[in-house]
Amino acid sequence: LTKGIVKRGVTELVTPGVATSDKLLENKTNNFLAVLHLSDPLCGIAFLDITTGEFYAAEGNVEYMDKLMQSFQPSEVILSKSQVKRFKEQFDTKVYTFQLDEWVFREQYAYDLLLQHFQTQSLKGYGVEDLRSAIVACGVAIHYLKDTEHANLQHINSLQRITATDFLWMDRFTIRNLELVHSSYEQGTNPVSYTHLRAHETRED
């Protein structure tokens, strides 16, 4: 028998946006965590898939944020506690949400976290240096992963800026009827993921 106090390691905390199940890997299905920073005049958003390491950032108005949410279909959205009411009023979604304290959304804190994570002196090489609200969202994403005890983040080694021309925009009705992201049937074939949609880009000569 062991005498004294037995120290036990802290395990990773699993929430919908940071789940890394084998089923997701087998189906090549993205599981995006989203961080939304509702600010004026421009909001910022980050999408991060801890399984694949994909990390995206964007900035724009609420309508643009809503369109991106429809396209990426995140399984969890991180918000500051003060923005929950506004989120419910402006976004028509039942996605799982988690709230963090206001101080986590400080711009300098988020910026420093990203510099530390990417081991760089600036974010110019990632094309997001001028996206102040998006930088906040990205920094909060890294904070959340660390806060939920996800220590192995070396595979998250790039950050891609999203522009409005990157997507073919469709409304919720079209997406639902075409079953582009989630099947309307609980049983049956696997849904077509955002990854699969991106793999078939239309090129213009």
How does the language model describe each region?
Residues 1-198, 203-205:
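Charged catalytic and DNA/RNA-contacting regions of genome-maintenance
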